[in-house]
């Protein structure tokens, strides 16, 4: 399989002209830095293994073959766990600790039994047959999130160092954008949509300690893990957790100064991404900031992934092609956002920020 994909990758996909960007494209700036961690753009607008290219169609055909897909799913999971543990992320130990805790008591307290899940959310996802609606997915979410930082900064000597770079650059991009474009609007209320088990929400709460933060997610399993961890922290303003659909939160309009979506959009079909951006616009006050951080289509690292790795990744990410094909910045403009800026905040990820006009 790897040989077939390698040949397809060499001969197919998008051509490599000097510059494919249209005149009105968003200029993507890289975070300044030296050494191998400095973000670099690839030669293409998006990876050749995504979208409607011959290589992408070949990968899609392989994934659609169910016996092979089952093997890919198992292989992908094994690769992720093994790689994490080689990076000193105690994946199995962290998972066991959650599953053997009293987190189950939190579930009924936080779950909205009347919530209707969107159809795309009920599909197998990330090698879990139940998608994000399972205890195993919730228990493994934090080590999986830690792995994101280590994969982005492989030369980091520790997970802590990798997180300092990945999360630090992300938070700095948010703060710099808000200071420049908010018109002196203070960040008093924060919403983290698709908060998972609360990792990004906690970073935001620590960056802006005087603000009130809300973490919102479709998975009551993830939220139960997030709430259990938050209860053990002594925070001036404890994070509030909400079980709701990020496209229709039910929260009041004009009630937040910052809305964040961290590593959410690549997990959604294009229609849901548009819905999330529209809801964020409704929720933000004039001068408020939206910040979306996720895989960058222009990332040199992602564009140059090996055939085996990008095939395994696509086998557990059903909406990856839609994400890469969507012009996120233009979608934000069409919704009404201004000052749309995209920056590579690490070698794999971009942070896209924008403002609600006054």
Regions found by a protein language model. Name each.
Residues 1-30:
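N-terminal chloroplast transit peptides
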Residues 35-146:
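N-terminal auxiliary segments of SAM/dcSAM-dependent transferases
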Residues 184-248, 275:
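Class I SAM-dependent methyltransferase SAM/SAH-binding core
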Residues 257-271:
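A short SAM/SAH-binding and catalytic strip from SAM-dependent methyltransferases
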């Amino acid at each position: 399989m790897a040989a077939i994909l390698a040949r397809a990758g060499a001969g197919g996909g998008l051509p490599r002209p000097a510059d494919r960007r249209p005149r009105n494209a968003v200029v993507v700036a890289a975070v300044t830095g030296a050494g191998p961690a400095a973000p670099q753009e690839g030669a293409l607008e998006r990876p050749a293994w995504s979208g409607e290219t011959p290589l992408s169609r070949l990968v899609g055909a392989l994934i659609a073959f169910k016996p092979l897909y089952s093997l890919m799913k198992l292989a992908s999971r094994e690769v992720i766990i093994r790689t994490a543990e080689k990076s000193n992320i105690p994946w199995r130990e962290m998972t066991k600790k959650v599953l053997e805790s009293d987190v189950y008591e939190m579930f009924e307290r936080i779950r909205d039994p009347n919530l209707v899940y969107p159809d795309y959310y009920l599909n197998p996802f990330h090698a879990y047959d139940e998608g994000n609606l399972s205890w195993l997915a919730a228990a493994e979410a934090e080590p999986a999130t830690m792995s994101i930082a280590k994969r982005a900064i492989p030369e980091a000597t520790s997970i802590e160092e990798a997180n300092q770079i990945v999360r630090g650059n992300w938070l700095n991009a948010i703060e710099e954008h808000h200071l420049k474009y908010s018109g002196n609007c203070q960040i008093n209320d924060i919403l983290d949509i698709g908060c998972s088990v609360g990792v990004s929400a906690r970073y935001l709460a620590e960056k802006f300690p005087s603000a009130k933060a809300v973490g919102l997610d479709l998975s009551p399993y993830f939220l139960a893990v997030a709430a259990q961890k938050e209860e053990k922290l002594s925070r001036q303003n404890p994070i509030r957790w909400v079980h709701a659909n990020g496209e229709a939160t039910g929260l009041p309009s004009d009630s937040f100064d910052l809305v964040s979506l961290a590593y959410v959009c690549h997990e959604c079909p294009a229609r849901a991404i548009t819905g999330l951006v529209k809801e964020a616009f409704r929720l933000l006050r004039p001068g408020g900031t939206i910040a979306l951080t996720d895989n960058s289509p222009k990332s040199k690292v992602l564009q140059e992934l090996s055939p085996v790795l990008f095939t395994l990744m696509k086998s557990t990410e059903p909406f990856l092609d839609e994400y890469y094909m969507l012009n996120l910045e233009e979608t934000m403009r069409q919704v009404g956002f201004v000052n749309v800026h995209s920056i590579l905040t690490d070698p794999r990820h971009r942070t896209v920020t924008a403002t609600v006009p006054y």
